[in-house]
Regions:
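C-terminal binding/interaction regions
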Residues: 48-106
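Phosphate-handling active-site elements
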Residues: 1-8, 33-52
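Acidic-glycine-rich active-site phosphate/pyrophosphate-binding loop
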Residues: 1-11, 69-75
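Amphipathic alpha-helical interaction elements
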Residues: 17-18, 41, 61
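Conserved phosphate/anionic-ligand binding catalytic regions in large, soluble enzymes, centered on
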Residues: 17-31
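Acidic, glycine-rich active-site loops and adjacent beta-strand->loop/helix elements
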Residues: 10-17, 36-37, 76
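A short glycine/serine-rich beta->alpha loop
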Residues: 12-20, 83-87
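Short glycine/serine- and small hydrophobic-enriched flexible loop segments
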Residues: 30-38, 100-104
Length: 106
């Protein structure tokens, strides 16, 4: 990826800047879908993007049932063990799953 892409996605981590909101794997995937199918003119239809995003979200929800970082990682948050290798491994698995499903959607 270009350095600019990595820079602009840095804030996605831990549910948007550590806020616990939407999982960065989802947000990054939606960005990738937009990059491929997005419109450049506001007059153009966005139905294809919405279809692809909803397909991806359905796949993600089928596996994880939640979209927010807080909900996905609540076991670690409740125990105060968020910054552990186990939680990082879990999140890496989420990112891997998201990438795999994104590839199918694209």
């Amino acid at each position: 990826f270009p350095e600019e892409v990595l820079k602009c996605t840095t804030g996605f981590g831990t549910g948007m800047g550590g806020s616990g909101n939407v999982c960065g794997a989802i947000t990054g995937s939606v960005m990738a879908i937009g990059l491929k199918y997005g419109r450049v003119d506001i007059e153009n239809d966005n139905a294809k993007v919405f279809e692809k995003v909803n397909d991806f979200i359905t796949r993600f929800n089928g596996r994880y049932k939640k979209q927010d970082c807080s909900g996905l990682t609540c076991a670690w948050r409740e125990k105060g063990t968020f910054k552990t290798p186990e939680r990082r491994k879990f999140c890496s698995a989420i990112v891997g799953f998201a990438a795999s499903e994104l590839e199918k959607v694209l």
